[in-house]
Amino acid sequence: MSAPRIGVLALQGDTREHLAALREAGAESMPVRRRGELEAVDGLVIPGGESTTMSHLLKDLDLLEPLRGLLADGLPAYGACAGMILLASEILDAGAGGREALPLRAIDMTVRRNAFGRQVDSFEGDIAFAGLDGPVRAVFIRAPWVERAGDGVEVLARAAGHVVAVAGIEPDA
């Protein structure tokens, strides 16, 4: 069995770090910036960054609708921070004036952008994470939280009483 080919959306965020972590875990990893690259992967990581900027880059590069289609067809995806925001079905405080964060609608959840406050309110701390033996060190920089998790969405972690990590569960799983 060959290693899965996992793409990392390379528009913003920790692209190199995600690519290296995937390789270390045994996956074949590649940056994704074009439609052909998107269509060549078995899964996708959407890193952190600025969700409105990432949304408009996806749109400008003609990746938004193809990505929505692939996700609707079951492409596995992981989203960190802005990536989690974009994977949501609904985004609160999405922006205005043509610079809104655009939901990919991959997970039935409502996410609030910048929920923990402004840059000056950033913090880090240890959080319990479902399925892991010990706490995970997490960094929250203008971070989102999940306001609503729909049916088929498993809550994985909370911080300061708010859901900060989820998994969308396939109906067949």
UniProtKB/Swiss-Prot annotation:
The organism's place on the tree of life at top rank: Bacteria
Which UniProt key words apply to this protein?
Glutamine amidotransferase, Hydrolase, Lyase, Pyridoxal phosphate
Database matches in InterPro entries: Class_I_gatase-like, PdxT/SNO, PdxT/SNO_CS
Q: In which pathway does it act?
A: Cofactor biosynthesis; pyridoxal 5'-phosphate biosynthesis
Identify the EC number(s).
4.3.3.6, 3.5.1.2
What is the catalytic activity of this protein?
aldehydo-D-ribose 5-phosphate + D-glyceraldehyde 3-phosphate + L-glutamine = pyridoxal 5'-phosphate + L-glutamate + phosphate + 3 H2O + H(+); L-glutamine + H2O = L-glutamate + NH4(+)
Show the GO cellular component annotation of the record: cytosol; glutaminase complex
Q: Can the keyword Electron transport be found in this entry's annotation?
A: no
Name of one Pfam family that matches: SNO
Instruction: List the Gene Ontology MF annotations in alphabetical order.
Output: glutaminase activity; pyridoxal 5'-phosphate synthase (glutamine hydrolysing) activity
For biological process, the GO terms are:
pyridoxal phosphate biosynthetic process; pyridoxine metabolic process
Which residues are recorded as binding L-glutamine? 49-51, 113, 141-142
Q: Where is the active site?
A: 81 (nucleophile)
Q: Which family does it belong to?
A: Belongs to the glutaminase PdxT/SNO family.
Q: What does this protein do?
A: Catalyzes the hydrolysis of glutamine to glutamate and ammonia as part of the biosynthesis of pyridoxal 5'-phosphate. The resulting ammonia molecule is channeled to the active site of PdxS.
What name goes with this protein?
A: Pyridoxal 5'-phosphate synthase subunit PdxT
Q: Look up and give the organism this protein is from.
A: Mycolicibacterium paratuberculosis (strain ATCC BAA-968 / K-10)
Q: Which gene encodes it?
A: pdxT
